[in-house]
Amino acid sequence: VEWTEDERTAIKSKWLKINIEEIGPQAMRRLLIVCPWTQRHFANFGNLSTAAAIMNNDKVAKHGTTVMGGLDRAIQNMDDIKNAYRQLSVMHSEKLHVDPDNFRLLAEHITLCMAAKFGPTEFTADVQEAWQKFLMAVTSALARQYH
């Protein structure tokens, strides 16, 4: 992926402002509520039968925080995201058997939560474009093992 300096700045400056313990759980909860078929990968999380159960599930929140924390690897390796996520791609493909489209769905929910948090004056269209490009690079890297 080729990054412009403006894209790098938009991505890294927003990353410094993100509270991963806020955005991560929000995005994961939304994913599991809006896209309930994704719940099959989280059977060990306990009760996911209702939106209220998902909203109050500590394991969902913790996994959302873990996922957001994992984005730091991509931030630190923007010029080689595919290799930075090689082992995670293998794990999600060969061990967990996650549908790679779920990565894209979660990226959409992360973007939505960021837009809601920062608002249109701070999460401008240009910032959104950079973040979507970044998250698509991450999802592509995670799906790499599937190809």
Curated annotation (Swiss-Prot):
It comes from Anguilla anguilla. The gene is hbb1. It comes from the Eukaryota. Residues 2-147 form the Globin domain. GO terms for biological process: hydrogen peroxide catabolic process. Involved in oxygen transport from gills to the various peripheral tissues. Gene3D superfamilies: Globins (1.10.490.10). Belongs to the globin family. This fish has two hemoglobins: cathodic and anodic. The cathodic Hb and anodic Hb display small and large Bohr effects respectively. In addition, the cathodic Hb displays a reverse Bohr effect and appreciable phosphate effects. The keyword Transport applies. One of its GO terms (cellular component) is haptoglobin-hemoglobin complex. Heme b binds at H63, H92. One of its GO terms (molecular function) is haptoglobin binding. Keywords: Heme, Iron, Metal-binding, Oxygen transport, Transport. Red blood cells. Heterotetramer of two alpha chains and two beta chains. This is Hemoglobin anodic subunit beta.
